[in-house]
Design a protein with these regions (language model features):
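Conserved kinase catalytic-core segment
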Residues: 17-32, 82-145
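Conserved ATP-binding subdomain of kinase catalytic cores across diverse folds
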Residues: 1-78
Length: 145
């Protein structure tokens, strides 16, 4: 769950718009078959909330093993970090990540750039361990900021 500062303030009003834009970004990705968390917006007179289902949970008591891309890069990719796509392509070349998951990370990077997201750091993409179909599933902060 994310929420805005109080509405009626410059930060609150800006964050309200960003949270709504993030929900729209998730809806666009879902409509095109990209596995993303279900998310909805709840607006009140005081705040805007973005409520999402965690992608790393299984039922009420379980969890998928996810690792942030920054940790995976540090463990397996020599050299400095460039972007999600470069790291995932290097992992695919090492056969540590399915090629289609690397392509999905590249598409997510391009989508983020298209919507003006300048916050695509390596903590905002996680890899699901042991699930090739969902390997690049963990996406955070798709807001155009």
């Amino acid at each position: 769950m994310k929420f805005s500062p109080p509405l009626g303030t410059p930060f609150g009003d800006r964050w309200s718009i960003l949270l709504q834009a993030e929900a729209l970004a998730l809806q666009v990705l879902a409509a095109h078959g990209v596995p993303v968390a279900d998310a909805r917006i709840l607006c009140s007179d005081q705040r805007t909330d973005l409520i999402s289902t965690r992608y790393d949970r299984i039922g009420t008591a379980g969890a998928r093993h996810v690792v942030p891309l920054d940790a995976v890069h540090d463990a397996f990719v020599p050299g400095p970090r460039r972007d999600w796509a470069a790291t995932c392509q290097a992992l695919a070349a090492q056969r540590r990540l399915p090629v289609d998951a690397a392509a999905q990370a590249s598409a997510l990077l391009q989508f983020g750039r298209l919507i003006g997201n300048t916050d695509m750091h390596f903590g905002n993409l996680s890899l699901v361990v042991g699930s090739p179909a969902d390997a690049a599933r963990g996406r955070f902060s798709l807001a155009p900021v």
